[in-house]
Structures are given as structure tokens and as C-alpha cells.
């Protein structure tokens, strides 16, 4: 099923879409309206189905978008959202990366790809790949993972990453 809701963060509207069955299968969002959100939903559905997840796009009302919004604005801790995630279609490595990031890097903090890789005895490139494939943005705070010399990449848009970090109170992201 899918549930879509809009919320305000200061001057910006965020539209959050949640794909779910018993638990959250995937999350996507847009600061650029419904049309861009639909593109993001299509990309998420393709990603999930390519990984064997059965997705039902029947619209259903749910409090899950509000949960994600409350995590975004800091009313609920990211790690408290982990229990709502299905982890369907993720590899054991990705699940470990997502859980470690969510539990260890708190709101208002950032970590480099290299630092997270060292923590997990992996490579920065493998961490970057896991971040790019993260089906649970905001709950699993991939926006908090930065390059050693700049903000780093972010799907769908780098300015989304900047906004999410600023919303959390991060002022600088270079060492």
C-alpha cells in the first residue's frame, strides 16, 4: 500500500510517500511537489521490485508519513523508527550499515563515508553504494554521511541533503 501526506517545515512543504505492507517497505519524499514525488515513487517501486519486494500501490491512510515527519523535525529519534522498517530487499551488509548509522550518528551530527566504513570494517565505496540504495531515507539518516571534503552526493538532489542537515542544526560539514 501507499500513503502520501504533506507537511510544512518552515517555508517549505515536504510531501512524504510511504510504501508499506505490515511494515515500511520504502520511503520517498519531495520538496518540489507531487509531480517530482511521483517520479521518486516510480524509482523506489522499480528499486524494490528489482530486489524481489512485492509492492502494492493501493492508496491507504496511514500514520507512517507522520512518523517520518516527526523523525525529521526531531520529535522522535531515528533509532525509534527502526522497528517500523521491513528491511525487505536489503542485503545483510546494507541492513548492518543502516542499523549502525541510525543508532550511532545522532541528529545534528555527521560522519564521513570513510569513518562509517572504518566502523563497519568496510570500504568508503561500499558505504556510498549502501547509502545510494537506502530505501528508508530520513529514518535511516543517509543524509548525515558526508564526503571528507564536501557535503557529498544525495539522491534525489544535493540541495535536499543540505536542507535536511540544516533542519537538524548542522552548520558545517567539512573538517
Swiss-Prot record:
* Gene Ontology cellular-component terms listed: cytoplasm
E.C. numbers:
2.1.1.63
Under Gene Ontology molecular function, one entry of this record is: methylated-DNA-[protein]-cysteine S-methyltransferase activity
Instruction: Provide the active-site residues from the annotation.
Output: 142 (nucleophile)
- GO BP of this protein: DNA repair; methylation
The UniProt entry, under PROSITE patterns, shows: MGMT (PS00374)
The record lists the catalysed reaction(s) as: a 6-O-methyl-2'-deoxyguanosine in DNA + L-cysteinyl-[protein] = S-methyl-L-cysteinyl-[protein] + a 2'-deoxyguanosine in DNA; a 4-O-methyl-thymidine in DNA + L-cysteinyl-[protein] = a thymidine in DNA + S-methyl-L-cysteinyl-[protein]
Determine if Ion transport is one of this entry's keywords: no
Q: Does this UniProt record's set of keywords contain RNA-binding?
A: no
Which keywords has UniProt assigned to this entry?
A: Cytoplasm, DNA damage, DNA repair, Methyltransferase, Transferase
In terms of InterPro entries, this protein maps to: DNA_protcyst_Mta_Thcoc, MethylDNA_cys_MeTrfase_AS, MethylDNA_cys_MeTrfase_DNA-bd, MethylDNA_cys_MeTrfase_DNAb, MGMT_N, MGMT_N_sf, WH-like_DNA-bd_sf
Matches recorded under SUPFAM superfamilies: Methylated DNA-protein cysteine methyltransferase domain, Methylated DNA-protein cysteine methyltransferase, C-terminal domain
Main location as per UniProt? cytoplasm
* Pfam family, any one: MGMT_N
State the source organism's domain of life. Answer: Archaea
Where in the cell? Cytoplasm
Job of this protein:
Involved in the cellular defense against the biological effects of O6-methylguanine (O6-MeG) and O4-methylthymine (O4-MeT) in DNA. Repairs the methylated nucleobase in DNA by stoichiometrically transferring the methyl group to a cysteine residue in the enzyme. This is a suicide reaction: the enzyme is irreversibly inactivated.
Q: Which family does it belong to?
A: Belongs to the MGMT family.
Q: What else is known?
A: This enzyme catalyzes only one turnover and therefore is not strictly catalytic. According to one definition, an enzyme is a biocatalyst that acts repeatedly and over many reaction cycles.
Q: What is this protein called?
A: Methylated-DNA--protein-cysteine methyltransferase
This protein's encoding gene: ogt
Amino acid at each position: 500500500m501507499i500513503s502520501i501526506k504533506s507537511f510544512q517545515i518552515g517555508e517549505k512543504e515536504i510531501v512524504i510517500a510511504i510504501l508499506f505492507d505490515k511494515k515500511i517497505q520504502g520511503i520517498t519524499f519531495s520538496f518540489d511537489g507531487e509531480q517530482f514525488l511521483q517520479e521518486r515513487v516510480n524509482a523506489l517501486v522499480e528499486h524494490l521490485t528489482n530486489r524481489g519486494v512485492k509492492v502494492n500501490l493501493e492508496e491507504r491512510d496511514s500514520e507512517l508519513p507522520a512518523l517520518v515527519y516527526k523523525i525529521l523535525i526531531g520529535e522522535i529519534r531515528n533509532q525509534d523508527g527502526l522497528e517500523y522498517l521491513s528491511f525487505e530487499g536489503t542485503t545483510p551488509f546494507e541492513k548492518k550499515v543502516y542499523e549502525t548509522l541510525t543508532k550511532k550518528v545522532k541528529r545534528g551530527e555527521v560522519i564521513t563515508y570513510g569513518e562509517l566504513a572504518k566502523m563497519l570494517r568496510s570500504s568508503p565505496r561500499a558505504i556510498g553504494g549502501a547509502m545510494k540504495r537506502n530505501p528508508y531515507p530520513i529514518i535511516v539518516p543517509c543524509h548525515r554521511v558526508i564526503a571528507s571534503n564536501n557535503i557529498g552526493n544525495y539522491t534525489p538532489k544535493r540541495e535536499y541533503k543540505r536542507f535536511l542537515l540544516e533542519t537538524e542544526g548542522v552548520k558545517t560539514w567539512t573538517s
